[in-house]
């Protein structure tokens, strides 16, 4: 829930409630809804089982959290998942799931940030780390975990394309204040993020518009090499 009161809200109190459905969607639900084709769904399942690091990108309301929930169902039940969120909103039914949630400073109790939780993550010996959303400097801590060989991670980011998703990741890493060359950060991202799934929303429909594999970062050209897996036809409504 988010609220703005006058004078900042000119026409009176503005209240926005984000209501979560009690129903937890599966991959078949997304296929039936036209979110993706079956072969794309099968490929995404293969990426999770192969422990690829997957980044889900899209604008507000495109279904990033829903897809993250669905992909989490493909994680084998014998693997230990560490789920880290700023605000708890991911509902994952898994036998060995550990949930961490950031905390704001309140009544003299110090805050616990996403960055704090990511730094503590390895002490809990997770097989997979799921970060609800990349928003700021915590991207650097996530990147460090991925660079240490922690495979099979999932996360989301606000972006309008797969290419912009990696640019956004880079910008968030820089927000951490880390003293690393720009191209070194991009090279680390190119080595660590394996797959980007782009989501879009049109009237009455949310769908996967693009799936790419990240091959590498070319420092000479200052660009990423992508392997196209799926591109939504332009005429998609």
What are these language model-derived features?
Residues 187-237:
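Conserved P-loop NTPase
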Residues 61:
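Walker A (P-loop) phosphate-binding loop of P-loop NTPases
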Residues 5-7, 17-19, 58, 101-102, ...:
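Flexible glycine-/small-residue-rich
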Residues 1-50:
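P-loop NTP-binding catalytic core
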């Amino acid at each position: 829930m988010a609220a703005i009161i006058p004078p900042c809200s000119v026409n009176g109190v503005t209240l926005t409630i984000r209501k979560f459905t009690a129903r937890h969607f599966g991959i078949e639900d997304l296929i039936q809804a036209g979110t993706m084709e079956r072969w794309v769904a099968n490929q995404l399942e293969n990426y999770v089982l192969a422990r690829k690091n997957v980044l889900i990108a899209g604008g507000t309301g495109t279904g990033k959290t829903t897809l993250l929930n669905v992909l989490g169902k493909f994680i084998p039940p014998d693997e230990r998942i560490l789920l880290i969120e700023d605000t708890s909103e991911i509902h994952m039914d898994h036998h060995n799931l550990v949930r961490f949630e950031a905390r704001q400073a309140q009544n003299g109790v110090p805050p616990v940030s996403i960055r704090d939780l990511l730094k503590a993550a390895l002490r809990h010996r997770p097989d997979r780390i799921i970060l609800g959303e990349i928003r700021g400097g915590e991207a650097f801590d996530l990147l460090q975990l991925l660079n240490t060989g922690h495979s099979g991670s999932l996360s989301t980011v606000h972006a309008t394309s797969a290419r912009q998703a990696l640019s956004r990741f880079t910008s968030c890493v820089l927000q951490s204040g880390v003293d690393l060359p720009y191209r070194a950060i991009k090279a680390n991202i190119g080595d660590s993020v394996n797959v980007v799934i782009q989501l879009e929303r049109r009237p009455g429909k949310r769908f996967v518009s693009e799936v790419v594999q990240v091959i590498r970062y070319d420092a000479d050209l200052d660009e990423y090499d992508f392997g196209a897996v799926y591109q939504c036809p332009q005429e998609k409504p």
